[in-house]
Amino acid sequence: MAAQIPIVAATSTPAVARNSKKRPASPSHNSSGGGYGASKKKKLSASGFAQGVSIEAMNESKMASSELSSGPVEKAAKPLPFKDPNFVHSGHGGAVAGKKNRTWKNLKQILAAERALPWQLNDPNYFSIDAPPSFKPAKKYSDISGLLANYTDPQSKLRFSTVEEFSYIRRLPSDVVTGYLALRKATSIVP
């Protein structure tokens, strides 16, 4: 039985070399006897060797790169003009210190916090601020339909958007016209 293990190992390695398309870690790769468990042990020892070789190669490359970079040290010593040399990071706050990142408050929380503040009657708010008039021209709406009105009747000063509204406005009595103008707060004395 012990004599068969080296034979199995010898037959499994050429299969790896012959069929290079299969991954070496796949269970279908070890088709020879010995089962999955036996080949797993062999792979662990082989991968351990490969890792040892790669670590040694990495250490050698680091040493070689450090020998090459020892020449121009003057460029690294020059301080950057936009960095403060006396800056010391406080170390508290943020995710680095183990604190949670800030979360946004929703509208209810903001309003509740504002209500809890000691407001005076003279304090400015959005309703007490007098804003200057806008530079954009105000939109004009029809007095009859409420649609955007591009036209104004020169006789009654009512706004309209279509031809049908214009004919309707021309048939209105003067008291109804003054009522429409009063709704728009544009009362003008019409003779």
From Swiss-Prot:
Compartments, record wording: Nucleus
Residues spanning the signal sequence: none
Pfam families: YL1_C (PF08265)
Principal subcellular localization: nucleus
Keyword DNA repair appears in the UniProt entry: yes
One GO cellular component, as annotated: cytosol
InterPro entries: INO80C/Ies6 (IPR029525), Vps72/YL1_C (IPR013272)
Region of interest (Disordered), residue spans: 1-41
UniProt keyword annotations, A-Z: DNA damage, DNA recombination, DNA repair, Nucleus, Transcription, Transcription regulation
Transmembrane segments: none
Superkingdom, taxonomy of origin: Eukaryota
Coiled-coil ranges per UniProt: none
Gene Ontology biological process: chromatin remodeling; DNA recombination; DNA repair; positive regulation of DNA repair; positive regulation of DNA-templated transcription; positive regulation of telomere maintenance in response to DNA damage; regulation of cell cycle; regulation of chromosome organization
Function: Proposed core component of the chromatin remodeling INO80 complex which is involved in transcriptional regulation, DNA replication and probably DNA repair.
Subunit comment: Component of the chromatin remodeling INO80 complex; specifically part of a complex module associated with the helicase ATP-binding and the helicase C-terminal domain of INO80. Component of some MLL1/MLL complex, at least composed of the core components KMT2A/MLL1, ASH2L, HCFC1/HCF1, WDR5 and RBBP5, as well as the facultative components BACC1, CHD8, E2F6, HSP70, INO80C, KANSL1, LAS1L, MAX, MCRS1, MGA, MYST1/MOF, PELP1, PHF20, PRP31, RING2, RUVB1/TIP49A, RUVB2/TIP49B, SENP3, TAF1, TAF4, TAF6, TAF7, TAF9 and TEX10.
Name of the protein: INO80 complex subunit C
